[in-house]
Curated annotation (Swiss-Prot):
One of its GO terms (biological process) is nitrogen fixation. This is Flavodoxin. PANTHER family: FLAVODOXIN 1 (PTHR42809:SF1), FLAVODOXIN 2 (PTHR42809). Pfam families: Flavodoxin_1. Residues 4-173 form the Flavodoxin-like domain. Its cofactor is FMN. It comes from the Bacteria. Belongs to the flavodoxin family. The lineage of its organism: Bacteria, Pseudomonadati, Pseudomonadota, Gammaproteobacteria, Enterobacterales. Keywords: Electron transport, Flavoprotein, FMN, Nitrogen fixation, Plasmid, Transport.
Amino acid sequence: MATIGIFFGSDTGQTRKVAKLIHQKLDGIADAPLDVRRATREQFLSYPVLLLGTPTLGDGELPGVDAGSQYDSWQEFTNTLSEADLSGKTVALFGLGDQLNYSKNFVSAMRILYDLVIARGACVVGNWPREGYKFSFSAALLENNEFVGLPLDQENQYDLTEERIDTWLDKLKQAVL
């Protein structure tokens, strides 16, 4: 088993594709990505380093049945982590959003995961600068004007995705390896 676990929730399949691309680029140091609707709490807790990916739905929500998803996803999986101790774990987040059509909640669901893992004792790495994005609001921005993780816009900036992932992974490797 590798030391990095990649977990994602997806509604349209875009987050799954990005998770698979990240896995490919990590070249053997991460296990294959797991969809949270099929993952167990034990699998999640078995990794010292976690890469968590989510799209943002509706008004800045995690995917899940209550957000209108067809299947269980992050909303339901986070319930299984309510008492989990993530102390000693390192977490990095990536989120998908549409900064033009959902400008008022761009990648805001990343903040929900961020708050959850911080509250459970994890160390979060992989912040990303705000520059290069045009949106009106994101809950995923920290006070230092950086995102809590890597924001990706597959609708409007798909041509920047691979370069952003490469830069982000280089930063993560320095932080955790």
